[in-house]
C-alpha cells in the first residue's frame, strides 16, 4: 500500500492536468481571456542528507483571468544530479524480496525527468511597473530512464514522482508600450516525493532551493 502512495498521487496530478486542458482551450476559442506564455530556467541546490541538484527548463501556457491572476498548464525537462554515498549496495543484499530493487536494472547519478503541472501565478502591483509575483506549481514529474537514481545511501525506485514548486520574485516589464512582456527573477523551492530503497522500501522526500529566471509574453 505504501509503495503505491506516491504513484497514485502523481497519477492523480497527471489526470487533473489533462482534464484542465479543455477548460483552458475554451476561453482561447471564445476570446474571453488573454493568452499568456512563460519560459523559465531554474537551478536548485539539494538540501539534506538525501538530496539532488536540479537544472530545469519549463514552459507554461495559459490565460490571464485578471491583472493579478494567471492560470495555465506547463511541461518541461529537468536534469537531476545526485551525490550518492557508497556505504550501501543493495545489489549485494541477500535479504531482497518482492518489494526490493531489481538487480537487472542499472544505476545512475544523473536522472532526466519530465515535469507536468498546473501553474497558478499571482502578481502584485501594476503590470506596467516593477512588482512582485508569487508562483505555485503542482503536478507530477516522471523519470524517463529505466535506471535507478542513486540518492544518499540508497536508490529512487519509482519513476512517477509528486512535484510541488513555489517561487517568489520580481516581475520587470520590458516596455511601457507592451507591458505583457516581462522578465521574472525569483527564489524557488522544489519538493519531489517518490519511493526509496535502503534495505527496505520507504518514502523519499527531496527538497531543493535555488533561483529561477524567466520571460513572459
Region locations from a protein language model:
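Short glycine/proline- and aromatic-enriched beta-strand/turn motifs that initiate or cap beta-hairpins
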Residues: 9-64, 216
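Short loop/turn motifs that connect adjacent beta-strands in outer-membrane beta-barrel proteins
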Residues: 25-35, 51, 68, 125-132, ...
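Transmembrane beta-strands of outer-membrane beta-barrel pores
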Residues: 41-47, 77-81, 122-124, 138-146, ...
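Structural signature of outer-membrane beta-barrel channels/translocons
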Residues: 62-64, 68, 121-127, 169-175, ...
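Outer-membrane beta-barrel translocator domains and adjoining extracellular loop/strand segments
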Residues: 50-54, 84-90, 144-153, 196-204
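Helix-adjacent hinge/juxtasegments
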Residues: 90-143
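Predominantly the C-terminal beta-signal and adjacent terminal strand-loop region
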Residues: 78, 84-85, 113, 131, ...
